[in-house]
Amino acid sequence: MSIRLYKSYTPGTRNRALSVFDELTKTTPEKSLIRKNHRNKGRNNRGIITVRHRGGGHKRRYRLIDFKRNKYGVEGVIASIEYDPNRNARIALVNYTDGEKRYILQPKNLTVGDRILSGSGSPLNIGNTLPLNEIPLGSSIHNIELIPNRGGQIVRAGGTSAKILAKDGDYITLRLPSKEIRLVRKECFATIGEVSNNDAFLVQSGKAGRTRWLGKRPTVRGSVMNPCDHPHGGGEGRAPIGRTRPLTPWGKPALGMKTRKRKKLSDAYILRRRS
């Protein structure tokens, strides 16, 4: 993937940097693998806003992604590389030898015509899915299961990968993209390689409208609100916070306050927290 940098022809192109999409080989998705995608836009079942700054955006159709990779022993051929509006990684359409078609996350350097395989004993090639205990130390992996047979849950964003640091008994030590070091069961599956689109973090919208197309609404500072709307609000002109520390709109400590539960069960598997 490559990034196109725009000159300031108009205010909308100033500071714009967008994907070129030169790696895509197909523009229309596979009809059997798409579904309607009803988005809640930050509302709960009562219509109350529970997550702010969401709403609008372009209509999307959801692509069914195979995160489990449970076609064990059945070889698949990469038929096309496609765009997915629901994630910043590219997806690959796989044609299996038994006739089934599935979408997977495209690993970096996996191209049309390449062959992939899942299951124990598969070759150590990019795009193949194996149990963690069969993947060598130092390998880059993605789409990692946390619970066996549940499907990949972590390391799925564009350009991300985890690294295998050690193997000890029933657990494998991984270093995640967040620098967190975590233990995972050796029976869990993972895919070899790095997720495609490693330049996704370089994209800059250049204008507010492009961000609205993604379904993101504006964020208003608490200091410009009224005191009935935010703890930072009120005062004459540009007033200081007036509190000992920054607070959320609901009066909870903000900016640096750790929000993870102190006695969460998964703490036993985290050797070092993310930095």
Swiss-Prot record:
Chloroplast listed as a keyword: yes
Location(s), subcellular: Plastid, Chloroplast
Main location group: plastid
Keywords associated with the record: Chloroplast, Plastid, Ribonucleoprotein, Ribosomal protein
One GO BP annotation of this record: mitochondrial translation
One GO term describing the cellular component: mitochondrial large ribosomal subunit
Annotated region described as Disordered, given as residue ranges: 219-254
Gene Ontology terms, MF aspect: rRNA binding; structural constituent of ribosome; transferase activity
Recorded superkingdom: Eukaryota
Entry-linked SMART domains: Ribosomal_L2, Ribosomal_L2_C
Keyword Plastid included in the entry's annotation: yes
Subunit relationships: Part of the 50S ribosomal subunit.
Family the UniProt entry places it in: Belongs to the universal ribosomal protein uL2 family.
The name this protein goes by in its record: Large ribosomal subunit protein uL2c
